[in-house]
């Protein structure tokens, strides 16, 4: 199981606050760019919750109607990273990682391409030990064992579900452990 913040799905406009404040409301749509479109908001109190809930549930993001919200516990990360596994065309799955997460990965790859780490994953054996060590070094990971376990879980999620993309942005370091703070 990949560690994530405590969360609750809201599909009803009459729903009451599901957890103590503050928490984050996230539009549930099958597209990226939710934050830029106003589909991710912090709720500090009940008034903000009601305003943001109504606004986001009435939203359309990139031609996708919002039908649900994820209320998620606010988590303070010491660091934020980026991690994804993607399948493009007929090539092997590719892991993409960056020690700067929580941002637009396309912008980072344009402005500072040396920060992006890309490596192919053998679909039969997964990442090799030397690849994991290299990745941990490039991402400046302190707890390497936690990182190796986390990467293994992400690989299994990708391969076991037949996904074309698993993206974690940001991948947070919270209390010394890795946590998927947002994903698709």
Question: What does each model-identified segment do?
Answer:
Residues 5-7, 25-52, 82, 104-108, ...:
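Glycine-rich phosphate-binding loop of ATP-grasp-fold ATP-dependent ligases
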Residues 1-21, 27:
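A conserved helix-loop-beta module that forms one wall/lid of the active-site cleft
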Residues 19-35, 62-78, 83, 154-158, ...:
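ATP-grasp fold ATP-binding core
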Residues 38, 94-143, 184:
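ATP-dependent carboxylate/phosphate-activation module, predominantly the ATP-grasp catalytic core
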Residues 51, 55-62, 135:
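Catalytic core of tubulin tyrosine ligase-like
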Residues 131-171:
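A long amphipathic alpha-helix within ATP-dependent nucleotide-binding catalytic cores
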Residues 62-120:
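Hydrophobic alpha-helical hairpins/lids featuring a short glycine-rich hinge
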Residues 172-184:
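Terminal amphipathic helices with adjacent charged low-complexity linkers/tails
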């Amino acid at each position: 199981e990949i560690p994530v913040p405590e969360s609750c799905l809201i599909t009803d406009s009459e729903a009451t606050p599901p957890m103590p404040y503050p928490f984050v409301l996230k539009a549930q749509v099958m597209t990226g760019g939710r934050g830029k479109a106003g589909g991710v908001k912090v709720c500090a109190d009940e008034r903000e919750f009601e305003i943001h809930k109504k606004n986001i549930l009435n939203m359309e993001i990139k031609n996708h109607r919002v039908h649900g919200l994820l209320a998620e516990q606010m988590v303070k990360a010491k660091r934020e990273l980026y991690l994804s596994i993607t399948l493009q065309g007929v090539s092997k799955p590719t892991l993409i990682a960056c020690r700067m997460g929580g941002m637009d990965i396309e912008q980072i790859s344009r402005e500072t391409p040396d920060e992006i780490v890309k490596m192919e994953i053998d679909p039969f054996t997964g990442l090799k030990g030397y690849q994991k060590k290299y990745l941990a070094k490039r991402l400046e990971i302190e707890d390497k064992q936690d990182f190796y376990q986390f990467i293994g879980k992400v690989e299994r999620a990708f391969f076991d579900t037949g996904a074309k993309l698993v993206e974690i942005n940001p991948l947070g370091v919270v209390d010394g452990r890795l946590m998927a703070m947002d994903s698709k």
